[in-house]
């Protein structure tokens, strides 16, 4: 998670996929405390390698942080998503994720064949409001964001991959264009 927060996404993804490829019992699909490093044996029902609640919950926590996390007074969406998850025709959807600022839902629809993506965000405000909501969109071919529309209006608060949405609204309809 530290790598994700520091913007070192390649390292973060290496950790994420490493937990899947090495840290799971092949016949149980749950993480375990350890494997035998020399033989690679990972019999999931051996007393020291039983399903390990801490490791499994850590994998869930990392997945959650890849999709949504809070940084001080901001909500950050999709900051840890691999480019492959945003290939043409794919979608990412998060429903009612709990934050300090109330539940947040969002959906990203990729249409990168036409160099665009569509994002909807719903934030059920509670007594506290985030300063901003940031959405990170990593184009599979590395193309930068060139134009953004928020709720049908031109929007200028964006960088190469990150769109910064204003606080105080509950619904956002965002069209993002790449070139």
What positions do the PLM features span?
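Non-catalytic C-terminal accessory modules of carbohydrate-active enzymes
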Residues: 2, 9-179
């Amino acid at each position: 998670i530290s790598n994700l927060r520091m913007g070192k996404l390649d390292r973060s993804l290496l950790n994420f996929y490493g937990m899947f490829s090495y840290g799971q019992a092949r016949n149980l699909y749950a993480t375990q405390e350890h494997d035998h490093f020399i033989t690679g044996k990972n019999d999931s029902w051996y007393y020291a390698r039983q399903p390990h609640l801490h490791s499994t919950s850590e994998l869930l926590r990392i997945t959650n942080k890849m999709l949504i996390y809070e940084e001080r007074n901001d909500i950050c969406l999709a900051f840890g998503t691999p480019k492959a998850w945003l290939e043409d025709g794919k979608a990412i959807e998060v429903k009612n994720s709990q934050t300090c600022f109330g539940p947040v839902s969002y959906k990203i629809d990729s249409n990168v064949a036409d160099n665009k993506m569509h994002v909807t965000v719903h934030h059920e405000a509670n007594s506290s409001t985030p300063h901003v909501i940031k959405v990170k969109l990593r184009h599979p071919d590395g193309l930068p964001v060139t134009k953004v529309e928020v709720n049908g209006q031109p929007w200028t608060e964006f960088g190469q991959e990150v769109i910064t949405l204003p606080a105080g609204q509950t619904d956002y309809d965002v069209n993002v264009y790449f070139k």
